[in-house]
């Protein structure tokens, strides 16, 4: 009897399926598997960078402009389609799935600047970086110390930033800084966002950067940044009018802008896990031990079953949260839930897939170790798993005095 085997790459559920979504998912899948995966397998082990040709083709296919409005030459689609594309790209190389977020920073600029930069961003010709974390300020955004001092016609930035990925190649770095001294009694006050425009491949006067050596997330560099009287013009204070009127504007902007990135991280986590699952399904049917494929042994079959169920469950929640966001029912709590569950699942599934590969999985000859290394990061960036649990619990329980 011939059975139809479950495809680890299931179609979009009927409740969410449209011809447009099917088309963009297939477009991203074909590009990821045919163009990105072979390059990732070659470049990641040697810590090579994403080739400009890949970025150019991504721009031509519209992947940078998925959520950019059509009036700015984007596709004008939603979070759901963005998640579809991210999952497919992450299945091949998470760094490529991450770079599509770099165009979204153009939306944070003021209207006059959006009109200039968003059409470029939609084509992948203008990409940004985000400088928020500091040596002593990670999950606790309100504890940042980088200062913005008002001078004639602009601001001088001074301080340190950590974990600024793509800072060297970006056209603009959005910097989170304070325009007043840190006050423990008013921790959120005085936080602002500044758009520091720059030439790709260089740092402007007053800014220097040192690459951070990472165990994964290769394909681009992540920097520690030092600001030393780095000048930013007045019109590059993000949300100038509201920022002047509202002392908490910068903190609100930073915190409110995390829902879509967390859905994006869930999609990347699912893509990594799916890649590991697909590779494991193929490997266990080929690998022979004790005179038979290891896929014949129940322990192997149950591992595969658990992995597949985990991936499917997280994808289902991601679809729901993304669809709700597009319907104007965005929920910080549900975004935190899906980010937490998908990241934890991704580390677990990629680890199990590596286990099924045995010693071969612990080499750079196969991509499984890349999925495993990159999955570990999803529990840290865009809010750690612990912070996600804090957000969810705070929405379910009365406030705690430990705030």
Residue positions per predicted region:
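C-terminal helix-coil-helix/basic helical segment that borders enzyme active sites and/or dimer interfaces
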Residues: 37-46, 281, 285-295, 308-341, ...
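Glycine-rich phosphate/pyrophosphate-binding beta-alpha loops
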Residues: 162-168, 216-217, 260-261, 377-384
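A structural signal for short hydrophobic beta-strand segments in well-ordered beta-sheet cores
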Residues: 146-149
